[in-house]
Amino acid sequence: IVPQLLMCRVYNEPSTLVHLLPFVDIGATLYTVAKLRADGHRLLRGAYMMPVHGKEGKGKSTDEYYLEAVRAATEVDWTQCGTLASVAERLVRLKGIGEFLANQVCADLRYTPQWRDAPDWTSFVLCGPGTRRGLDRIAGIRNPTGNKTQKHYQEAMAELWDLELSDKLEAQIMDHFIDRNNLSNCLCEWDKYERVFWGEAEQLRKYKQQ
């Protein structure tokens, strides 16, 4: 299931995934992708960037680059991973998969039958760039870079939860944050808002008051 979820995070448009899943081999998928693109199908939703990295990606299309990672994922024995953290650790060893994408796969994986009882279900998260900057802002840092270690930010998020949030949120809201990724998402959105508010970045999307 891990390779299929990785496919879902690479091609994150539901109407496209109907034609691409399950992943079998690169050639067949590239053929289908090319046909869908030629027919005007939207392949990516733009929720996050999918860049090609380093010398491994030189001369390759985005499709080829990430499909090679999906193929490599089909050769891993994921049953040997006992925690979400171990899945993420193994994912980032695949060429082309960074911490952000690995965390997104694990965010989905925790809601599958095989992983709903993972021992780190309520605690695991890999903090992406936006989450890191959001945590820095809460710590009082202006124009943050989010360049400290993953361990630092994981500890900062745990401290934020334990000391500031766990006994102050209404039960209905708190239920959502049992999945630590939801807190991570809030920190990322907070960073986007603050970057625009302080003139650190251009506004790409309009904020709508509810």
Where on the chain are the PLM-derived regions?
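A general marker of short, structured functional hotspots
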Residues: 7, 27, 44, 61-62, ...
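A contiguous catalytic/ligand-binding core that recognizes phosphate-bearing ligands
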Residues: 34-90
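Structure-specific DNA junction-binding interface
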Residues: 1-56, 210
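Acyl activation and transfer enzymes in specialized metabolism, enriched
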Residues: 94-95
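C-terminal accessory module of base-excision DNA glycosylases/AP lyases that mediates lesion recognition
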Residues: 63-77, 81-86, 103-210
